[in-house]
A protein has these predicted regions:
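ATP-dependent carboxylate/acyl-activation modules
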Residues: 1-78, 103-104, 119-121, 126-162
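Short, glycine-/small-residue-enriched flexible loop/hinge segments at domain edges that mediate gating
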Residues: 73-89
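Residues at alpha-helix caps and immediate loop-helix transition turns in enzyme cores, especially N-
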Residues: 90-94, 126
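Charged helix-capping and loop-helix junction motifs
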Residues: 94-100
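A short helix->loop->beta-strand "cap" motif at the edges of active sites that frequently abuts
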Residues: 109-112
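Short beta-strand elements of ligand-binding domains
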Residues: 114-118
Length: 162
């Protein structure tokens, strides 16, 4: 992750921490939102595999590379990504990077659940990009971040069928 961050240290700084016992990849950003999501995930019985945050900026490539790096971890059972309403970051760029990495990794969202919850500039394009990957669940600001966390926990418990 450090190498990815060094690519352009002035554009979307990454903070990352792994949890050895976790099995749900977390790419929830926005500082406090990320911590809230991790706490909610644990309250609901999920096990976060990591903590992740990236500062505001146009960072499609960093999201792509970070998603690829996170997906390399063995034993993952699902992925949640998103954040609070973004005022500075185009969410379509974030979603494009994530979906590109998922597609290249050959992720089948029926077997490996993916839940995204984004809101902010570029939302319509983000929705279209997310819809291009079958069975990826995409939520907007009418769904709370806690609701999206609940959904990834449910999906990983269900054995990933939507």
């Amino acid at each position: 992750m450090r190498e990815i961050d060094r690519m352009d240290p002035h554009n979307g700084a990454i903070r990352f921490l792994e949890f050895p016992e976790g099995d749900i990849a977390c790419m929830v950003t926005s500082g406090g939102a990320a911590l809230t999501a991790l706490g909610q995930l644990m309250v609901l019985g999920g096990r976060p595999a990591n903590a992740f945050d990236i500062t505001a900026g146009p960072h499609e490539e960093k999201m792509y590379l970070a998603t690829r790096a996170i997906l390399e971890r063995p034993g993952l059972r699902g992925l949640i990504a998103g954040g609070n309403v973004k005022n500075f970051t185009r969410v379509d760029l974030q979603v494009r990077g994530i979906v590109r990495a998922l597609r290249e990794a050959g992720i089948d969202a029926r077997r490996f659940p993916v839940v995204l919850r984004f809101a902010g500039p570029g939302l319509e394009a983000a929705r279209d990009i997310a819809a291009s990957l079958p069975d990826l669940e995409f939520y907007e600001d009418d769904t709370s971040l806690e609701g999206a966390v609940r959904r990834i926990v449910e999906r990983t418990r269900e054995g990933a069928s939507p």
